[in-house]
A protein has these predicted regions:
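A well-structured
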Residues: 1-215
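A short, hydrophobic C-terminal helix/tail in secreted or cell-surface proteins
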Residues: 216-221
Length: 221
């Protein structure tokens, strides 16, 4: 049976020379910035100046960009080897962290969608430049928004619910080696390779992909 060698990606563009101390420091900095941003909650007013409003938007953008970089790193590191307990644990930790950050910033999102009156909304959108369409879209979602506590629960459940199940599914199915007969020849492949065949232009190849003869766990060296 063919052995599949795991490759390793260079993720230095996301986090250079990553180690626990560096990641912890980055997460702490993001959390600190988010906590600082939270302090504006009580002072938010629909009559806010366009300049200050735009600055707040860029503050959120900066926080989410930094959080997304670490999230992307964790996700790609996990995809590199879904059988790694270390990578799985790290992704879970970072995903939960990202959810916590979203919950800290949620008040601003709901304030913009629900509490800002139409006249002030038009005024602020007009001076928002590239972010104007984003702000208009947010306003369209107002009627679907829940209370802040309810929205926070949904964000948390996204991490511990469906996302956790998908991760478990990936961990199980990516461990298998599939034996498939294609063009009269038996081939062994992993789930990603099998998925490619499922999307083949040839009907017989697609049929073979979903009718694999059996699957086994790979033999450890």
């Amino acid at each position: 049976m063919v052995r599949h060698e795991l490759g390793k990606w260079n993720l230095n563009e996301l986090i250079k020379n990553p180690n626990r101390a560096i990641v912890d420091k980055k997460l702490a900095n993001i959390e600190s910035t988010a906590k600082k941003f939270e302090k504006i909650k009580k002072s938010l007013n629909p009559n806010i100046s366009s300049k200050k409003f735009l600055r707040l938007l860029h503050d959120i953008e900066n926080i989410m960009e930094k959080s997304s970089l670490i999230g992307g790193y964790a996700s790609l590191r996990y995809s590199e080897n879904t059988q790694s307990d270390e990578a799985t644990s790290f992704l879970t930790r970072v995903t939960k962290f990202g959810s916590d950050i979203e919950n800290r910033l949620l008040f601003f999102d709901l304030w913009w969608k629900i509490q800002v009156d139409e006249n002030n909304a038009r005024r602020l959108i007009k001076s928002a430049g590239q972010l104007s369409e984003y702000l208009r879209f947010k306003r369209l979602l107002a009627k679907y928004s829940l209370s802040e506590p309810e929205e926070k629960i949904i964000n948390t459940l996204d991490v511990t619910g469906a996302t956790a199940l998908v991760k478990l599914y990936d961990k199980i199915t990516n461990a298998y080696i599939y034996v498939v007969t294609v063009d009269g020849k038996k081939r062994t492949m992993n789930r990603e390779q099998l998925t490619t065949l499922v999307r083949s232009k040839k009907a017989k190849t697609r049929e073979a992909a979903v009718s694999y003869t059996h699957l086994t766990l790979p033999t450890k060296a």
